[in-house]
């Protein structure tokens, strides 16, 4: 929003340990925030004095100050208010404890803390991860961020899990820099769609990231911050326990659910694993099913088209014969029909060939780094994603939307449940 555009201006004077919260729900409205004096931060990233920051539709923002500040808000948010009750000081105390563990790890030349954030949906898990990561980087650390939430896909797109070395704070209105993330294709937005495959991917991602920690001294001492899904009962709880074991987690922060906290105290807490209960922020907003679907769609749109800095994806044709398309998992067979020596679970991680058809239209396909199906395709990380925008059965050609020009870097493609209607 430029200075010559109309828009009501409101000044907010924030006292010590308070935050300005606002939400953007409607149309094409934008809000610009400027720090006029004092110090303030957004989820651990410091605001620069007198620099305007722009937020668009869907933004749910909480700007916090430890020492007091004045903020100018320009535009018409749906809701804007100052909150004096905030758990930020508790979050900072947890970060101080993590930093103490990192300093100790540096002195002893051992691995730094591996911390996992858990809790039900809409309690602020990814926000708390962002706060911990930003604070760590501001102190000169280089932690690895792991995202196991296939529902929102904070590192790549929904339907994936991944890891990223964080080297600088996230820009105020965007996420962390996406250079060279390690991403694995799951293909669904809920782990319950294929629990066996999801666990196998967690094991593979843990093995790879723990190896990477050992190989990079600065990252090794900095440790990891792990974000998880909001499914915390039954199968979801099993996945939390599995992730804690595979990543060799030594700190678990439980947001806003005492039942989960007590279960983890019973099943995980020990001399080597601390379990800490934290309240959620009052600024956390419950999302409807349609808001979640819209957020997923926006993540995929950003992947192809960018957000603040527009990207220009490529559209080109690929012959059916030039690619091999698979999905992971086949329908479960009764025990009596299984081949000798095969377990029922094996079906869930089986590679099943998919014949090109109109059913692929609008589907997201992951481009695997695997060069042949002799490799372990399901546990190979992915180079990126494409979207099928047209299927010509007569010419035997797929038209695809791709972030890179032709040719595709590899020819093994994995089908995702996710679809994207390209409206550009």
Curated annotation (Swiss-Prot):
One of its GO terms (cellular component) is mRNA cleavage factor complex. The gene is cbc. It is found in: Nucleus. One of its GO terms (molecular function) is ATP binding. It comes from Aedes aegypti. Belongs to the Clp1 family. Clp1 subfamily. Signal peptide: none annotated. This is Protein CLP1 homolog. One of its GO terms (biological process) is tRNA splicing, via endonucleolytic cleavage and ligation. Disulfide bonds: none annotated. The keyword Nucleotide-binding applies. PANTHER family: CLEAVAGE/POLYADENYLATION FACTOR IA SUBUNIT CLP1P, POLYRIBONUCLEOTIDE 5'-HYDROXYL-KINASE CLP1. Required for endonucleolytic cleavage during polyadenylation-dependent pre-mRNA 3'-end formation.
């Amino acid at each position: 929003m430029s200075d010559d555009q109309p828009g009501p201006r409101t000044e907010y004077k924030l006292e010590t340990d308070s935050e300005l919260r606002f939400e953007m729900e409607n149309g094409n409205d934008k809000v610009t925030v400027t720090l006029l004096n004092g110090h303030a931060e957004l989820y651990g990233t410091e605001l620069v004095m007198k620099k305007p920051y722009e937020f668009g539709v869907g933004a749910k923002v909480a700007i916090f100050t430890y020492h007091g500040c004045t903020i100018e808000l320009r535009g018409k948010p749906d809701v804007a208010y100052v909150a004096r009750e905030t758990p930020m000081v508790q979050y900072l105390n947890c970060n101080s404890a993590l930093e103490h563990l990192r300093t100790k790890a540096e002195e002893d030349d051992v691995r730094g803390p591996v911390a996992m954030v858990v809790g039900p949906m809409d309690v602020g898990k990814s926000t708390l991860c962002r706060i911990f990561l930003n604070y760590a980087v501001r102190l000169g650390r280089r932690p690895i961020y792991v995202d196991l939430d296939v529902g929102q896909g904070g590192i790549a797109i929904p339907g994936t899990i991944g890891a990223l070395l964080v080297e600088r704070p996230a820009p105020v209105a965007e996420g962390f820099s996406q250079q060279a993330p390690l991403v694995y294709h799951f293909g669904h937005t809920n782990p319950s769609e294929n629990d066996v495959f999801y666990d196998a991917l967690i094991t593979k991602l843990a093995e790879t990231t723990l190896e990477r920690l050992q190989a990079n001294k600065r990252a090794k001492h900095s440790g990891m911050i792990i974000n998880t899904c909001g499914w915390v009962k039954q199968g979801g709880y099993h996945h939390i326990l599995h992730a804690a074991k595979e990543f060799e987690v030594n700190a678990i922060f439980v947001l806003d659910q005492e039942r989960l906290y007590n279960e983890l105290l019973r099943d995980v807490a020990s001399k080597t694993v601390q379990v800490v209960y934290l309240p959620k922020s009052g600024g956390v907003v419950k999302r409807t099913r349609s808001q979640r679907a819209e957020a997923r769609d926006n993540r995929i749109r950003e992947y192809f088209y960018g957000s603040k800095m527009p990207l220009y994806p490529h559209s080109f044709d690929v012959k059916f014969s030039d690619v091999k398309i698979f999905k992971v998992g086949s329908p479960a067979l009764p025990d009596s029909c299984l081949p000798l020596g095969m377990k029922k679970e094996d079906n869930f991680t089986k590679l099943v060939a998919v014949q090109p058809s109109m059913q692929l239209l609008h589907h997201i396909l992951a481009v695997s780094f695997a060069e042949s199906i002799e490799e372990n395709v399901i546990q190979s990380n992915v180079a990126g994603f494409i979207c099928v925008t047209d299927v010509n059965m007569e010419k035997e050609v797929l038209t695809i939307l791709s972030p890179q020009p032709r040719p595709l870097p590899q020819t093994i493609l994995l089908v995702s449940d996710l679809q994207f209607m390209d409206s550009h």
